[in-house]
Every structure is written in structure tokens, then in C-alpha cells.
């Protein structure tokens, strides 16, 4: 069939696991034509990933999905208990506990949400359907090539119905593999997985309903005993997940292909939990897997065919990072494709998908390797330790290292440790192309990290709102203007507004084509579909003169706020949001966040054109059109 006769798509997504469904939802909602297939006849029914970390919960809320997932009444894990062997082979005892999301991590969701992957998929699939895309099942990919025969849709993809063997050939701008560890697309590209270490541990995982007198069965636990190791994960519907060590490279007869029956794992669990007992009412799901940490050499070869999720990185599931990392992969991919296809960004920016996400995966694997080794390594038996075990030093020293690693890793495992390095989208004060305005004295935000949660009062309706959630995940860059005290910054705000209205400002150059028809009730994108603005004043609502706010900012009538809500993290502050983020209320400041809510840059709020000049310089570094005055020196 000639390319002109083939059905054309903006993107073809293969696989409907975590990375595929997030990417599919974003691209479908943002107006793209998506072809999405999965080789399974039905979505995940049981098992697989089940832990949503705090930062991922924040992302789900920004996607408008948190409420649906919480409707499943998932387990919420606020802390982790550590259990270790008693001396003399007398069983196990609790040696301590630690918050799963310690207070130094600023989050609204200081817990891990536990609900099985199938229920999470169900929520996404319903929303994908509402956005106009259907996941076609069971279909698989049998071939593809970037032949360039169609300049706009350069990739030809061959898909096959598993039920009927019918072959369908389509063309697409992009092809994305969310197929998992056995990715056909990765294999066809000849991209290898680099394994950090040979398989060292084999684990069994079992979901079921249990009866037990073990006191922490509803708490996440790491348990080391003379008989082996277990991790306990509470689940929804009175279930519990047990990860049970089956084999270790420390065993004289270690076999990485070793397997075990569900009954074998139950017997091992009973031994490990002594002196407590455990019995199973039912087993919902059971699997055996080896641990092998690996990462793909490349995430793309041509920036037309991409991969994400387990197709790119494999690791042990006990730190609960697989699904969460996939969410981040997908969101990163989605907003960058949108930036290019909307006409905002040059195609060259797509290279940052691999550099950013592979760097995070490397960090994950480094952490996971250490965490898995500490968790999986067998304790010395009571007989081996002998009388020395009475001091607990022999066993306790190793646990100290495990607990230390766990505590130091909390920020990373929560998702808030993700920090993208400086690049075209992430500018700090050291960026070579900068003006001094990118260095905001006292600011506490770090470019590359997630925007800090803050609570403010929305002027339109006096609602107390979470500022970081006020702009939904719509693919737009977010510009937060912390305007300080209105009487101190009125000229700076007037000048900023006047410069935003100039013909060559980023907001004007990328103005909506349908701006004359935009409804008064368009809360988020009244001027451009690529930028959204929020304005926060330090003061009480009744002290803020809305009429004196320039019209271009007043058009964001649902994005005008008063900074008047106390925050326990800055208890002495009169204006908590400004104080928490490090903005002087006499001067104010501006924060740009990327569409994934990671901080892109911070800019001083200055009189004249300087602030908008700086913003034009930032956006102009990747924009497809020239921004700003030719001299970049204009002043009002």
C-alpha cells in the first residue's frame, strides 16, 4: 500500500502498562491522534506493580485521577517497620520503624498508596476512552521502519491482530515502546540492556488474604531472620503482599533459575515469621522472579522511535519504583512531544528525553542495587554467630547499614529526589546564556526539582487552594509570579504586563489562533495554549486591589491569589508562600515550571523590561520562532 493510502497517526504506542497508559492519556487529551495497542486480551487482573509513591500521587492529582484511584480504598503506608533475629534462634523482634516519607520531604501525601496495577490501569483506560482513544487488544507489533517516504509521518508500522492474524500497516510521526522488559522494538533496533550485576537473588511474590498474629501485618515491614528475608506490603481488600527470598548467590548451590511453588513460599514464610504464625485464606496471585538490574544503552536512535518504562530499565520491585519511574518517563515524553508538535520547540529538544530519564534510571539502579543487596543478603544463622549473637553486634552492624541506606534513600524513593541536571529546559544561576536576573537572592527553589507545595487563597472565590495543582497537566509551561506587596511592586508588575503584550514576547508570538473566541470561563489558557500564568500577592484578600492589576494578568481571573495561609514549615512567616520559596515580599520574583511541574528557572521581578527579556531568553533558547527585541535592551 502506498504511504499516501495508509492510515496516519501522531503516535503509535505499543503496550498498555504504566508508561503506555500515561503517555496515551496525555497525548489523547492534548489533541493528538493516537494508535494504542496491547498484546494482552484484557487489562491486568491481578498482581504486578502496586505502589504509588508520594510524588506520583501528586502527578495523578494533576492529571485529575487521584480521586478515582482513592475510591478503591487502597492501603496507605506511612512508615516501615524493621524486624531482625533474636539471639539464640528465638525468632524475630521489631528493632525500629521509620516514616516512609519523613518530615523533611515537603509533600501533601506522606504515604505510599498500595493498590494493584489492574485497578490503576482501569482508571486510566476509562479516561483514555473519554479522550477519544481505544486500546486495541490483543494486537502486537511485527515490524517497523523509519523509511522517510512520508516526510510528516516517516515511520511505517506493521501491526497484527493476535486473534485473526490480520496485518494492518499504518504510518506515524512517532512510535513508542511501552512493551516491558521483552521489548520487540528494542530488540529490532539492536539496543542492548546493560546489566549492572549478574542475577544474585531469586524472590517469590504472593498476594493473598492471611490470618496471623504477626502484629505488623498491616504495616510495611522488612524482616530478616535466621531462615531468610521477607518484605510485607499491605494491600487493598484485606490483602497482603509478601516478597520471600527463595535463593541467594551466597547459597552453595545457587541457581538463578531456581523456582518454587506457592506452598514452598508459604512454608518459608512461616519459618521466617516465627514465633508468629500465619495461614492463608486465599492466594490471589503468585510469581517467582530473579533480580537483575539493567538499563538500556539508548532510549532512541532517531528521535522518532522511543522507549520507556521496563523496556529501558529493570530492577527489583521492593523499593516500589518501577511503575513510578514509568509515570515520570511517560510525562517527560508527552510534554516534549507536545512542545515540538505544537510548534513551540525545535525538534532537537527531544534528545533531552533520553539524557534526563536515563540519568534518573542510572540513579535508581545504583540505589536499587545497594538496597536489594542489603535486603536480600542472608543474616548469619544463630549457630554461625554463636555466643556473639547475644551482643547483637554481628547481626546489628549489617542492619545499621540497611537502615542507614533506607533512611538516606527516602527522598529518592518518594519521587521528590528526582532532580534534572541543567539543560535547555533547566536553567540555574550558572547557565552560560543568562542575565543576572536568573539569580534570585534567597530563593529556595532548585531548577530541575519539583515545585514546592504551597497553599494560597484564590481571589475569585476565596477558596484555599494548592498552588502547585492550580494548573492541570495540560502540556503548558507554568509561570508563577510572586508579586510580593502590591504597593511595593506595582510598577514592576505594570512593566511586566506591558512587555508581555509586546509583539515579540513569548506570550504574543505563541498567542492562540482562536483568541477572539476564547470563553470568559477559560481559566488556564486565555492567551496561549502553551503558557499559563498565576499571580500571587503577599497580603489579605481584601487588601489586594484587583482593578489595578493589568488586564493581561487579570484575564487569568482564576489564577489571582492572596498569600495569607499559614504553613507549619514556616510558622513565623506572615506571608508563608513567599517565605517558604524564598521570595522577598518587597521585591517578589518569578518561577517558571515545566509542564511536568519541575522548576525550569527563577527570575527576579524587576522594573522595566528585564523580567520579560529574561523569560524571552529562556523560551527563545528552544523556541521555533524568534522572541524578544532584537537588542534585548528595551526599557519602558
Curated annotation (Swiss-Prot):
The keyword Transmembrane helix applies. Its cofactor is FAD. This is p-hydroxybenzoate-m-hydroxylase A. Disruption phenotype: Abolishes growth on benzoic acid, benzaldehyde, benzyl alcohol, p-anisic acid, p-anisyl alcohol, and p-hydroxybenzoic acid; and reduces growth on p-coumaric acid and cinnamic acid. Belongs to the PheA/TfdB FAD monooxygenase family. One of its GO terms (cellular component) is membrane. It is found in: Membrane. It catalyses: 4-hydroxybenzoate + NADH + O2 + H(+) = 3,4-dihydroxybenzoate + NAD(+) + H2O; 4-hydroxybenzoate + NADPH + O2 + H(+) = 3,4-dihydroxybenzoate + NADP(+) + H2O. Pfam families: FAD_binding_3, Phe_hydrox_dim. The chain crosses the membrane at residues 11-28. FAD-dependent monooxygenase; part of the benzoic acid degradation pathway also known as the protocatechuic acid pathway. Benzoic acid debradation begins with the conversion of benzoic acid into 4-hydroxybenzoic acid through hydroxylation by the benzoate-4-monooxygenase bphA, and its partner NADPH-cytochrome P450 reductase cprA which act as a mediator in electron donation from NADPH. 4-Hydroxybenzoic acid is then converted into 3,4-dihydroxybenzoic acid (also called protocatechuic acid) by the p-hydroxybenzoate-m-hydroxylase phhA. FAD binds at residues 10-39, 241-243, 289, 310. Keywords: FAD, Flavoprotein, Membrane, Oxidoreductase, Transmembrane, Transmembrane helix. The gene is phhA. Binds 1 FAD per subunit. Its EC number is 1.14.13.33. It is a single-pass membrane protein. The lineage of its organism: Eukaryota, Fungi, Dikarya, Ascomycota, Pezizomycotina. Induction: Expression is induced in the presence of caffeic acid, p-coumaric acid, p-hydroxybenzoic acid, protocatechuic acid, and benzoic acid. The keyword Chaperone does not apply. It comes from the Eukaryota. It is an enzyme of class 1 (oxidoreductase).
